[in-house]
A protein has these predicted regions:
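Charge-rich, low-hydrophobicity low-complexity segments
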Residues: 1-150, 155, 165-170, 174, ...
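Short beta-alpha junctions and helix-cap segments that line functional grooves
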Residues: 157-159
């Protein structure tokens, strides 16, 4: 026979004595279970020590998520707080964060979407749709991507022929766009808009269309 395990309630956990000496533990807040010798607690950070894939499934968490691998193709990660990814975001993945998003490597794929209420920091972006309530800061380059930021969009000069450049795609930076090179002979048109949000631009296009119509009719 085993011996009783002595465990106490840690942070955000309430313990209640039940019948036959059984103790029940209840979480007092949303979060992830953290178990250490002799204690059980609930914390507001979910740590994934691997890639997000079939072993983990999609993630939806009320708090912060730290992923020590990459987010696999087609999987979804949602958090009310920040999301930190040590690796990359593969094609077709979706990420939604109520805070900031930091991606150690890059984002790739036309069906890939990243949305953050705060800022987004990423090594590079190729063909993905990234939208931020703050800045979008890219360490190397952006190619054929959609970038919408209420803050600044910045691409740093690093190493490699693509470094510091925005080539192709649609880029909106409400507070400005900072880069070394815009456009490329190898890509389609590069659309850059600074100082205006997309909805404002649509209204301006409609207004211009009305003015032109009035001039000719």
């Amino acid at each position: 026979a085993g011996r009783p395990l002595e465990v106490k309630a840690g942070s955000n956990v309430r313990a209640e004595d039940g019948v036959r000496g059984v103790t029940h533990f209840y979480a007092e807040t949303d979060g992830a279970i953290k178990s250490i010798p002799g204690e059980i607690a609930v914390v507001d950070t979910l740590v994934i020590d691997s890639d997000v894939g079939f072993d983990t499934g999609n993630l939806k968490f009320n708090g912060e998520i730290v992923i020590k691998g990459s987010v696999g193709q087609g999987f979804t990660v949602e958090a009310t707080g920040n999301v930190l990814v040590f690796g990359s975001i593969d094609a077709g993945a979706t990420m939604v964060a109520g805070g900031n998003v930091v991606i150690g490597h890059g984002i790739g794929g036309r069906r890939t979407r990243v949305v953050a209420r705060g800022e987004v920091r990423v090594g590079y972006n190729e063909e993905a749709d990234v939208r931020a309530g703050g800045d979008i800061l890219i360490g190397s380059h952006s190619a054929q991507a959609i970038l919408h930021a209420d803050g600044v969009i910045g691409v740093k000069r690093g190493e490699g022929p693509k470094s510091g450049g925005i080539s192709g795609g649609e880029v909106w930076g409400l507070a400005g766009i900072q880069m070394q090179v815009a456009g490329s002979n190898a890509h389609n048109m590069t659309n850059l808009t600074a100082g205006m949000d997309p909805e404002g631009a649509k209204k301006l296009d409609l207004l211009n269309g009305t003015v032109v119509a009035n001039l000719f009719f």
